[in-house]
């Protein structure tokens, strides 16, 4: 009888890749006409391949944002399929879909993202509770990143509301997500624009991967984000526009920007 190796969990997989390529950078793929300066659909598709070609060997993960593909209808969904295929199975691909439904609906979303498109992980909105998360936790090797304390300017309206025990809502989300991590495949999303909250989340969920958007165009604090995100567990720095549309938008400019981020991150981590 053959000997089968145990399945590696998603969180183990992302830590291993970070160590193997010495990178904690996630490259967001948010290709749009305004940023590129062209509303030609083929130009957008070509540019998405440029981003991947320029960063394939130095990106810990890629994060295509569904909205930028869905906006183009059926052709956009085909483009998304082609993008996942073009990235390939050696990289980690996170679906920035922010799904948040329950039951059978959530199950269909999970099948779409994991089985049809072939993503390794997905961003999820926890507002509807455990029913919106569990359908995505079926496979140990597929991960979820739960929105916890996001980088947008109005996030505090709900996320910094105090609960009965004086705990902030985002703190409750961090503890709750940590308690669901039975298969070692749950992570959190916390913005680089709120380093104090990021530090608090890391204390509450010391072992969960944290995906950290908001660096670059949103003006988040890179150094503090790297330090707080990686003082335990792994903190993954997501950069989209500042890499994808760097300089003259050539492969060389995109790669140079990505390399600069990897270098800055590794300097903070002393790796």
Regions found by a protein language model. Give the residues of each.
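Short, well-ordered coil/turn segments that N-cap beta-strands
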Residues: 21-25, 58-60, 89-91, 118-120, ...
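C-terminal helical cap(s) of enzyme catalytic domains, especially alpha/beta-barrels
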Residues: 223-234, 241, 245-271
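Conserved anion-binding
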Residues: 32-33, 101-189
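A C-terminal functional module that forms or caps the active site or interfaces directly
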Residues: 188, 192-238, 242
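Acidic (Asp/Glu)-rich catalytic clusters
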Residues: 18-20, 52-58, 82-88, 135-140, ...
């Amino acid at each position: 009888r053959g000997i089968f190796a145990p399945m590696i969990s998603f969180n183990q997989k992302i830590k291993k890749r970070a160590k193997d390529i010495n990178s904690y950078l996630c490259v967001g793929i948010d290709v749009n006409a305004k940023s590129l300066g062209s509303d030609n659909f083929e130009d957008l598709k070509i540019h998405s391949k440029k981003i991947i070609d320029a960063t394939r060997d130095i990106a810990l993960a890629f994060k295509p944002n569904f909205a930028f593909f869905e906006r183009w209808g059926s052709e956009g969904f085909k483009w998304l399929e082609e993008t996942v295929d073009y990235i390939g199975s050696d990289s980690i691909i996170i679906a920035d879909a922010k799904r948040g439904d329950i039951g059978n609906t959530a199950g269909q979303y999970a099948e779409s993202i994991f089985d049809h498109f072939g993503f390794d992980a997905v961003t999820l909105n926890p507002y509807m509770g455990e029913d919106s998360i569990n359908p995505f936790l079926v496979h140990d090797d597929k991960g979820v990143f739960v929105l916890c304390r996001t980088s947008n300017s109005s996030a505090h309206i709900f996320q910094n509301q105090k609960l009965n025990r004086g705990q902030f809502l985002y703190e409750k989300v961090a503890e709750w997500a940590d308690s669901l991590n039975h298969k070692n495949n749950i992570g959190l999303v916390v913005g680089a624009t709120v380093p104090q909250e990021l530090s608090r989340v890391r204390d509450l969920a010391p072992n969960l991967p944290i995906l950290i958007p908001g660096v670059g165009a949103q003006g988040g604090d890179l150094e503090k984000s790297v330090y707080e995100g990686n003082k335990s567990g792994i903190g993954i720095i997501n950069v989209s526009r500042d890499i994808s549309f760097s300089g003259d938008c050539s492969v060389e400019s995109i790669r140079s920007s990505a390399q600069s981020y990897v270098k800055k991150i590794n300097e903070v981590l002393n790796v």
